[in-house]
């Protein structure tokens, strides 16, 4: 078990990204997408194993979800890493994702960056992005990353940017609306209720 980065209050990166992944898995149901998660349980996979899963699956795109950490505990912000900026669709996806996630946390959009050194970007055969969802080393970011509505919001913007990337139609959410209807003979009774 590799906890990944660990916050001041002992929040584990692995737990946060697993929660985002599980939420995203639910949100993607009902779309015309074949999705493969490298993990939906607390099982450790090496970076090379993750790349191999994506390559064996022959994925069109690969997204790796992470939480950043820095020695300077004041640092906050969201960034997305790509191997190169040669794929316009991936660039649009990464820029949108970076902006949308930064807005959730009211954190700095640190932008889309390139690296040929990150294992999952270097070893995947498809366009790949790695998102760093804020800095767990910042106590306020760590707190925000423990709020379930923020986890849901991150999963939702990942879903929405994936939908946009593939040009898919949004499906109606399976929200159950409850309606209470009152019938009144006298309008004043309705107003006074």
Feature annotation, model-predicted:
Residues 1-51, 57, 169:
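Active-site histidine-acidic residue metal-binding/catalytic motifs
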Residues 2, 11, 57, 61-75, ...:
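Active-site-adjacent mobile loop/cap segments within catalytic or ligand-binding domains
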Residues 2-12, 69-96:
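A short, glycine/acidic-enriched catalytic loop
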Residues 13-16, 20, 24, 47-50, ...:
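Stable alpha-helical elements in mature extracytoplasmic
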Residues 22-33, 55-59, 98-106, 150, ...:
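Sec-exported extracytoplasmic/periplasmic mature domains
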Residues 31, 76-78, 127, 175-177:
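Envelope-exposed proteins and targeting segments
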Residues 88-113:
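Active-site-adjacent substrate-binding region
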Residues 171-193:
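Solvent-exposed beta-strand motifs enriched in subsets of small alpha/beta binding domains
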């Amino acid at each position: 078990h590799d906890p990944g980065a660990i916050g001041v209050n002992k929040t584990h990166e692995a737990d946060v990204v697993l929660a985002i992944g599980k939420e995203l898995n639910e949100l993607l149901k009902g779309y015309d997408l074949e999705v493969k998660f490298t993990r939906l349980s607390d099982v450790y996979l090496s970076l090379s194993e993750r790349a191999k899963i994506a390559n064996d699956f022959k994925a069109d795109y690969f997204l790796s979800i992470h939480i950043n950490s820095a020695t300077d505990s004041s640092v906050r912000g969201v960034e997305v890493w790509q191997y190169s900026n040669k794929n316009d669709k991936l660039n649009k996806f990464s820029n949108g994702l970076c902006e949308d996630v930064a807005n959730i946390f009211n954190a700095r959009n640190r932008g889309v960056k390139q690296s040929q050194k990150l294992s999952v970007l270097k070893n995947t055969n498809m366009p790949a992005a790695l998102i760093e969802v804020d800095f767990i080393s910042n106590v306020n970011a760590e707190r925000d990353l423990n709020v379930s509505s923020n986890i849901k919001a991150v999963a939702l913007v990942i879903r929405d940017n994936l939908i946009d990337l593939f040009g898919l139609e949004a499906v109606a959410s399976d929200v159950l609306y409850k309606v209470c209807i009152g019938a009144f003979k006298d309008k004043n009774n309705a107003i006074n209720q």
